[in-house]
A protein has these predicted regions:
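Long beta-sheet-rich domains in secretory-pathway and surface-associated proteins
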Residues: 1-226, 231-232
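Helical hinge/lid and interdomain linker segments adjacent to catalytic or ligand-binding clefts
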Residues: 236-315
Length: 315
């Protein structure tokens, strides 16, 4: 048998080196424990999202990263192994592992996150009157004992009322802050930006599917405020959902009453109360029951109703 000895483990990102000098026994799991202080490191933002995208193009400062499918590991370790008289070094990333009772061992990249994230509930708010609207900001703590001052910065012509001070005592604790926003006639279109303790804050978005590693990114905490002078006709709209669009929320923001319907709601006695029916984005492409739904909607049109079909693709 070949004698194998692990001499030390190190990490340049952590500025850490741990001397082991221990012989490894054949077919025996060796657990090595050590404590270290993690220095301040950049958050785990996908490299192509570090700068704001511009109409589908991305700005990447480090040209060597272009084409790489994912970020290099946030933290890597090196271990020096001695085989008799030969010495080799192996590198391996720090990863998070958990045991699932059904799927077995699951791995995901080690993520460095901000201490606090702030997610605004909608990407855009439309105002068609001077009536106030509620904007919800969800604060989440990634470590214990976090408190601070929340600040919302809006363009000229907008007034905001909200609680500024907050406390998050435990890791993963969440707090929803409701801000009341009112537009004036001089309100300018622009971004509502979220600051915590004077610093621009980031949100947290997660993509989690079984067939790919979990993906996270940290967009700027902000939403768009738009004041438009709209002359509305009608009040009540029926909406049949399409491919993940957010049109219903935007219509509600400008004062329409929106009901989300499915096929069981399409009786003529029910549809007659609506001023219009709106089909969601690519509804005709993705809804397998569209061939059976459309005759009911066209009958509604024959009876004097208004049907609006949004974007669809041709096959």
């Amino acid at each position: 048998a070949v004698n194998i000895e692990i001499e030390f483990i190190s990490s340049s990102e952590l500025r850490y080196e741990f001397s082991v000098n221990k012989k490894l026994e054949p077919n025996t799991k060796e657990v090595i424990s050590s404590k270290f202080i993690v220095p301040t490191l950049p958050i785990s933002q996908p490299y192509w999202l570090e700068e704001k995208a511009n109409f589908g193009t991305y700005n990447v400062n480090d040209q060597e990263l272009i084409g790489v499918p994912e970020n290099p590991p946030a933290i890597t370790f090196k271990a020096r192994l001695k085989f008799e008289e030969d010495v080799i070094e192996i590198s391996f990333p720090l990863v998070h592992k958990k045991n699932d009772p059904v799927k077995g061992e699951l791995y995901r990249p080690f993520i460095i996150a901000p201490k606090i994230t702030a997610n605004v509930d909608q990407p855009i708010y439309l105002f068609s009157s001077l009536a106030p609207q509620k904007v919800i900001i969800k604060l989440a703590s990634n470590t214990d004992q976090q408190k601070g001052v929340l600040e919302l910065k809006a363009p000229e012509g907008w007034s905001l009322v909200y609680d500024k001070e907050f406390t998050l005592e435990k890791k993963h604790q969440e707090l929803k802050v409701t801000a009341t926003i009112t537009a004036s006639k001089e309100a300018k279109e622009g971004l509502l930006e979220v600051f915590i303790n004077g610093e621009k804050t980031r949100g947290l978005n997660t993509i989690n599917y079984a067939h790919i590693p979990t993906q996270v990114w940290f967009p700027d905490s902000e939403t768009k405020l738009v004041f438009v002078d709209i002359k509305k006709k009608g009040k009540k709209i029926a909406y049949l959902l399409g491919a993940g669009d957010v049109v219903p929320e935007s219509l509600r923001n400008i004062g329409y009453d929106i009901d989300i319907l499915d096929e069981s709601d399409l009786g003529q006695d029910n549809l007659v109360k609506y001023d219009a029916i709106l089909l969601g984005m690519r509804f005709l492409n993705i809804n397998e029951r569209a061939d059976f739904i459309m005759p009911k909607l066209l009958k509604y049109c024959e009876n004097g109703g208004n049907l609006i079909v949004q974007y669809n693709t041709a096959h």
